[in-house]
Design a protein with these regions (language model features):
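N-terminal glycine-rich dinucleotide-binding loop that anchors FAD/FMN and/or NAD(P) in oxidoreductases
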Residues: 74-75, 79-80, 160-179
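Flavin-dependent oxidoreductase catalytic cores
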Residues: 1-125, 129-145, 153
Length: 179
């Protein structure tokens, strides 16, 4: 097997090589283009003509609008866990997103954040990623939400993802989503 280091844009160097080779065609690159700076830089530096993205739109259904408006602070970072690409030979048609629980369920009413008729004060016990996403969902519906976390700091176990360099996607998720 070929070792693969998880980078923001692991295939950009190959696209850049193709671009420099003098091919008379537009060169596109896919893989890891989630952050606006990476997209802008790759095109501005002439490394590619087109940037392709899929997971950025899965974790952020409004990615195009966020990009156009320059609202990178509103991005939900993709963990690149590949759960959106199917779950193996026994369940190839089931696809989910670790950071966008609505993905794949958009047409099912109970998963959508419709405004509530009666606002409630709701306590969410636990301030890990699941508790925080639940709080966001409930707040989006119009409820008043309070998160109770025993540790005094939000994030749960993901707070400890800083110390392993190859877990940078979790660190990005923590740093950008848990603020």
């Amino acid at each position: 097997p070929i070792p693969f280091e998880l980078q923001h844009t692991p295939f950009l160097k190959y696209a850049e090589h193709a671009k420099k080779s003098g091919l008379n065609m537009k060169i596109a690159c896919v893989g890891g283009f989630h952050y606006f700076d990476d997209v802008d830089q790759a095109v501005a530096e002439g490394k590619v003509d087109i940037v392709s993205a899929a997971r950025a739109f899965i974790s952020n259904p409004d990615y195009g609008q966020l990009l156009q408006e320059g609202r990178d602070e509103d991005l939900v970072p993709c963990l690149r866990c590949n759960k959106c690409h199917g779950r193996g030979k026994h369940d190839i048609m089931t696809t989910v997103c670790s950071v966008n629980p609505k993905f794949g369920f958009e047409a099912v009413d109970r998963y959508l954040a419709y405004p509530v008729d009666k606002v409630k004060d709701i306590a969410v016990i636990g301030g890990g990623p699941g508790g925080m996403r639940t709080a966001i969902y409930l707040a989006d519906r119009g409820h008043k939400v309070t998160i109770y976390e025993a540790e005094g700091e939000l994030g749960g176990a993901i707070r400890h993802s800083d110390y392993i360099p190859f877990k940078w996607t979790l660190k990005d998720y923590k740093d950008l989503s848990l603020i």
